[in-house]
UniProtKB/Swiss-Prot annotation:
Similarity comment: family membership: Belongs to the RNA polymerase beta chain family.
Protein's organism: Mycobacterium tuberculosis (strain ATCC 25177 / H37Ra)
Stored Gene3D superfamilies: 2.40.50.100, 2.40.50.150, 3.90.1100.10, DNA-directed RNA polymerase, beta subunit, external 1 domain, DNA-directed RNA polymerase, subunit 2, domain 6, RNA polymerase alpha subunit dimerisation domain, RNA polymerase Rpb2, domain 2
Protein role: DNA-dependent RNA polymerase catalyzes the transcription of DNA into RNA using the four ribonucleoside triphosphates as substrates.
Name under which the protein is recorded: DNA-directed RNA polymerase subunit beta
Composition-biased stretches (Low complexity): 17-32
Domain of life: Bacteria
One GO location term (cellular component): DNA-directed RNA polymerase complex
Length: 1177
């Protein structure tokens, strides 16, 4: 048991009290006080991992125009930076009335302080928001009078420090959306009938009509305006004022343009305009003025057409226009249209370059729509900005109408503006948009990954039904931008991704990744961020290309990648850039898989996804074998407490830490204690420092859920043996030691929230009370005088949490009852029990109660007088049927929990914790788990390379600090730059002996194991080591379900399905066939009638069982009556005949008394015996 004791002893360590088993050092890490992981990395990373939440926070700061964003924009050299809200107000202003005599303009958006802190918003179901004010100016153009006012524009949801929003008390995340960028796209297709290569181009705006040009099989160039009918492109040019001579002068080099001009029958601008108008507005009488206005509005007016800054940038870049000039206009220009047509013509004629009028030469080539140079991110700021734009445009209509109806003298900005459309648009986005999602709070990593998620779905994006293979596939331009591993399995595969570790989003929304600049074959530490299309023009070397001390490449020819992901060797002088890190291409979750390079990508995908499903355990334990990403991920996830300034710890308790800063100020950090996360897991923070300790700014001073010493700790280090065991671990089943149950090694706490409200009803107000009719004192024992369960009470399913009574409809009273009323007053008033009870299959301990009352001036929904929330915590030990997984996609369900004495044990008597089957490794090709097991054993037992005998080759490659390690050392093996196979073999041969002087595991990683039942050794050595195992959210307690009687469907009267509805198991068509095959006629009859939807029969059978009588004959199922009704609704006269041909009359809905009897039977079996079902019927 020695290994287990050592592993658990690490729990009591703190950042302030270093010990040999866990040395403390900040030498290898930029975070002060961080645990010192000995790293197998060979490469120096010149760039730290950027802020992992920057994709969310930076975007929101741009939206609100925060001072921090303005500073960073000034550093980038942006001229006159404009925030997102300012941009919308600028676009909207001025709003003019129909005559142009009045105008209203908006400027200077600003915020007041937020109304309540984050914790209070969560507690009271409020939205974390700040009041938004703008300056509105009303100008009377006739008199020149200006009225200016500050106008309240509603409460604006604000982002928390963690990159989330609190909407009505729930934490939500706005996911970034991957969309096709506005711009001009050239495409190539093969005509099926002639096998000709045809070319087309689309000009896609951010907002407005599409413009499409194409060359058809008859070699004419056509145009489609706003997806209407095709017409010759020369018609559009003539409509823009070009003469035939000008067209020939510009496009005379092209045969297809000359033939198009010959086939065009229109003469002059006017005729061309009318021709376009007829195509766009068929049925309306065309006039030259209306045609001119229509064409101008479609493409050349900012109100109707917007390429956006990014679209303008893409068009200029593709066509070589206005290169180097600042972007001013966001509409199309005549020059754009002409350059696009020329580019298309030259592309069709096979030319490779084109010189535009400015003298710039641009390459002529088709576009790949799945290339990351053509796909951009709509981050949270832009998504909210678009929604505000929608709300503002709705408000604009209201303002215009009010300008015409109100008295000019009395008008003020306040009287014109109705903020409801804007507030409604923002609420609609946060409450119902596909991109505003309930935050995944299973553990800190799942929350962090959710904030870095990229989705191609949502409004303006793709739909999973129409998305093909190409858009889902991994593309070479994803390198360093979107992780090729982490994506969901199932229908969303490839449509939802995750941002790579070093990636960032530029102001245009394109994802950039950093590279080290290479100058004349020398690698510098200068970092350059490149977008995907900029990278295509360069030659990039890998991060692990060998370089000497001066930064020169060691080898004369270097492995590089060029455009479209082609890999080749080139002379070192031709290299332009080099990767900054080997983990540059993967996401945070994928970067936390050690030995990722030895795993098949499919299994690595499962490993990355399953880390997000790990539940926080009662005691967290950092992995012995990490990747160096654990610390940064935990800090950026925001669930640990970090010291803001340097100082000394003055006071520590379980609930708070007080720090005396060096500048003399104090700061108290409050701990989050046993709070419920969005997914019912337990979020608890514990201090890891002691009074008197010195802490630096940025140091972790308290752990959160799934963290240990500030590092991400999603599972436990368990002693694993990889072998079959009596067939009990067949098909990925797992065998566990009972030690893990007894010592709460894999125990987790789950907290459920139960809520009930007391409302006003038509018959009177509901009441929360202890005085509940027909309930015994035993049941009420745990309720206080208000009728609310006490904190600390153990509750099981069916127990009352909150007593509540609801008034019943007054029935006609008998004379005797009236007499009783007269004597005893209102006491006998009719109420029914509507108490909050513990749902089926749940139990636990009450750990918290929150009561909100209108009397205490709490904000409650209309009609609600009182609201009570009860929190029930459940301690779940690991049990058969729970799902466990490693980090390599090696998942399984616990098939058997063995007593410790029956588990296989090592030569020193240490029993293993977990047995995995060998069959789970070879065909799945996730060899990383085996290497992790070996290195885990080395880390647990410690090692020492004896330098006196000479340092072997494998050890010569390692830094000096890796030549010796104490037992329980924590190591990191970064992805693509970790421990090599030779190093692992060497370390296994150098492991330290145990206290008896025995080395238990051989140099090949195998040990002699003994059968716990017989004490005999197994016939062959077995791989033994330490593997990091996580307990996943798929717990058997949540899945197991059984029903006796329960709710029925209203129409068919058949039992409902599913655990949530307390439903039954469906006995389907194929199961019926199985019964028929066995000839089990009576069982089948019962299944189809009294166990299902024979309403009368059900009650009679229940009655018979209770009384111990024989089961009566079944009646007619309700579904048969439903079938009859459906046939009758089709005007078919259907009759039911008995076996002798006589018509049977089906009674419409059996007696109400019978239904009442059924209800009573279902709930209360101790009712009066005299009232039998037969008597009632």
């Amino acid at each position: 048991m020695e290994g287990c004791i050592l592993a658990d002893s690490r729990q009591s360590k703190t950042a302030a009290s270093p010990s040999p088993s866990r040395p403390q050092s900040s030498s290898n890490n930029s975070v002060p006080g961080a645990p010192n992981r000995v790293s197998f990395a060979k490469l120096r990373e010149p760039l730290e991992v950027p802020g992992l939440l920057d994709v969310q926070t930076d975007s929101f700061e741009w939206l609100i125009g925060s001072p921090r964003w303005r500073e960073s924009a000034a550093e980038r050299g942006d001229v006159n930076p404009v925030g997102g809200l300012e941009e919308v107000l600028y676009e909207l202003s001025p709003i003019e009335d129909f005559s142009g005599s009045m105008s209203l303009s908006f400027s200077d958006p600003r915020f007041d302080d937020v109304k309540a802190p984050v914790d209070e918003c969560k507690d009271k179901d409020m939205t974390y928001a700040a009041p938004l004010f703008v300056t509105a100016e009303f100008i009377n153009n006739n008199t020149g009078e200006i009225k200016s006012q500050t106008v309240f524009m509603g409460d604006f949801p604000m982002m928390t420090e963690k990159g989330t929003f609190i909407i009505n008390g729930t934490e939500r995340v706005v996911v970034s959306q991957l969309v096709r960028s506005p711009g001009v796209y050239f495409d190539e297709t093969i005509d099926k009938s002639t096998d000709k290569t045809l070319h087309s181009v689309k000009v896609i705006p951010s907002r407005g009509a599409w413009l499409e040009f194409d060359v058809d099989k008859r070699d004419t160039v056509g145009v489609r305006i706003d997806r209407k009918r095709r017409q010759p492109v020369t018609v559009l040019l003539k409509a823009l004022g070009w003469t035939s001579e000008q067209i020939v002068e510009r496009f005379g080099f092209s045969e297809i343009m000359r033939s198009t001009l010959e086939k065009d029958n229109t003469v002059g601008t006017d005729e061309a305009l009318l021709d376009i108008y007829r195509k766009l507005r068929p049925g309306e009488p065309p006039t030259k003025e209306s045609a001119q206005t229509l064409l101008e509005n479609l493409f050349f007016k900012e109100k109707r057409y917007d390429l956006a800054r990014v679209g303008r940038y893409k068009v200029n870049k593709k066509l070589g226009l206005h290169v180097g000039e600042p972007i001013t206009s966001s509409t199309l220009t005549e020059e754009d249209v002409v350059a696009t047509i020329e580019y298309l013509v030259r592309l069709h004629e096979g030319q490779t370059t084109m010189t535009v009028p400015g003298g710039v030469e641009v390459p002529v080539e088709t576009d790949d729509i799945d290339h990351f140079g053509n796909r951009r991110l709509r981050t949270v700021g832009e998504l909210i900005q678009n929604q505000i734009r929608v709300g503002m445009s709705r408000m604009e209509r209201v303002v215009r109408e009010r300008m015409t109806t109100q008295d000019v003298e009395a008008i003020t900005p306040q009287t014109l503006i109705n903020i409801r459309p804007v507030v409604a648009a923002i609420k609609e986005f946060f409450g119902t948009s596909q991109l505003s999602q309930f935050m995944d709070q299973n553990n800190p990593l799942s929350g962090l990954t959710h904030k870095r998620r990229l989705s191609a779905l949502g409004p303006g994006g793709l739909s999973r039904e129409r998305a093909g293979l190409e858009v889902r596939d991994v593309h070479p331009s994803h390198y360093g931008r979107m992780c090729p591993i982490e994506t969901p399995e199932g229908p969303n595969i490839g449509l939802i991704g995750s941002l790579s570790v070093y990636a960032r989003v530029n102001p245009f929304g394109f994802i950039e990744t950093p590279y080290r600049k290479v100058v004349d074959g020398v690698v510098s530490d200068e970092i350059v961020y490149l977008t995907a299309d900029e990278e295509d023009r360069h030659v990039v070397a890998q991060a692990n290309s060998p370089i000497d001390a001066d930064g020169r490449f060691v080898e004369p020819r270097v492995l590089v990648r060029r455009k479209a992901g082609e890999v080749e060797y080139v002379p070192s002088s031709e290299v332009d850039y080099m990767d900054v890190s080997p983990r540059q291409m993967v996401s945070v979750a994928t970067a936390m898989i050690p030995f990722l390079e030895h795993d098949d990508a499919n299994r690595a995908l499962m490993g990355a996804n399953m880390q997000r499903q790990a539940v926080p355990l009662v005691r967290s334990e950092a992995p012995l074998v990490g990747t160096g990403m654990e610390l940064r991920a935990a800090i950026d996830a925001g669930d640990v407490v970090v010291a803001e300034e340097s100082g000394v710890i003055e006071e520590v308790s379980a609930d708070y830490i007080t720090v005396m800063h060096d500048n003399g100020t104090r700061r108290t950090y409050r701990m989050r204690k046993f709070a419920r996360s969005n997914h019912g897991t337990c979020a608890n923070q514990c201090p890891i420092v002691d009074a008197g300790d010195r802490v630096e700014a940025g140091q972790v001073i308290a752990d959160g859920p799934c963290t240990d010493d500030g590092e991400m700790a999603l599972g436990k280090n368990l002693l694993v043996a990889i072998m079959p065991w009596e067939g009990h671990n067949y098909e990925d089943a797992i065998i566990l030691s009972n030690r893990l149950v007894e010592e709460d090694v894999l125990t987790s706490i789950h907290i459920e929230e139960h809520e009930i409200d007391a409302r006003d009803t038509k018959l009177g107000a509901e009441e929360i009370t202890r005085d509940i009719p027909n309930i015994s004192d035993e049941v009420l024992a745990d309720l206080d005088e208000r009728g609310i369960v006490r904190i600390g009470a153990e509750v099981r399913d069916g127990d009352i949490l909150v007593g509540k009574v609801t008034p019943k409809g007054e029935t006609e009273l008998t004379p005797e009852e009236r007499l009783l009323r007269a004597i005893f007053g209102e006491k006998a008033r009719e109420v029914r029990d509507t108490s909050l009870k513990v749902p089926h299959g749940e139990s636990g301990k009450v750990i918290g109660i929150r009561v909100f009352s209108r009397e205490d001036e709490d904000e409650l929904p209309a009609g609600v007088n009182e609201l009570v929330r009860v929190y029930v915590a459940q301690k779940r030990k690991i049990s058969d049927g729970d799902k466990l997984a490693g980090r390599h996609g090696n998942k399984g369900v616990i098939g058997k929990i063995l007593p410790v004495e029956d588990m296989p044990f090592l030569a020193d008597g240490t029993p293993v914790d977990i047995i995995l089957n060998t069959h789970g490794v070879p065909r799945r090709m996730n060899i990383g788990q085996i290497l992790e097991t070996h290195l885990g054993w080395c880390a647990h037992s410690g090692w020492k390379v004896d330098a006196a005998k000479g340092v072997p080759d494998w050890a010569a490659r390692l830094p000096d600090e890796l030549l010796e390690a104490q037992p329980n050392a924590i190591v990191s093996t970064p992805v693509f730059d970790g421990a090599q196979e030779a190093e692992l073999q060497g370390l296994l041969s150098c492991t330290l002996p145990n206290r008896d002087g025995d080395v238990l595991v051989d140099a090949d990683g195998k040990a002699m194991l003994f059968d716990g039942r017989s004490g005999e050794p197994f016939p062959y050595p077995v791989t033994v080591g330490y593997m990091y195992i996580m307990k996943l959210h798929h717990l058997v307690d949540d899945k197991i379900h059984a029903r006796s009687t329960g709710p029925y469907s209203m129409i068919t009267q058949q039992p409902l399905g599913g655990k949530a509805q307390f439903g039954g198991q469906r006995f389907g068509e194929m199961e019926c066939w199985a019964m028929q095959a066995y000839g089990a006629a009576y069982t089948l009859q019962e299944l189809l009638t009294i166990k299902s939807d024979d309403t009368v029969g059900r009650v009679k059978v229940y009655e018979a069982i209770v009384k111990g009588e024989n089961i009566p004959e079944p009646g007619i199922p309700e579904s048969f009556k439903v079938l009859l009704k459906e046939l009758q609704s089709l005007c078919l006269n259907v009759e039911v005949l008995s076996s002798d041909g006589a018509a049977i009359e089906l009674r419409e809905g059996e007696d109400e008394d019978l239904e009442r009897a059924a209800a009573n039977l279902g709930i209360n079996l101790s009712r009066n015996e005299s009232a039998s079902v037969e008597d009632l019927a």
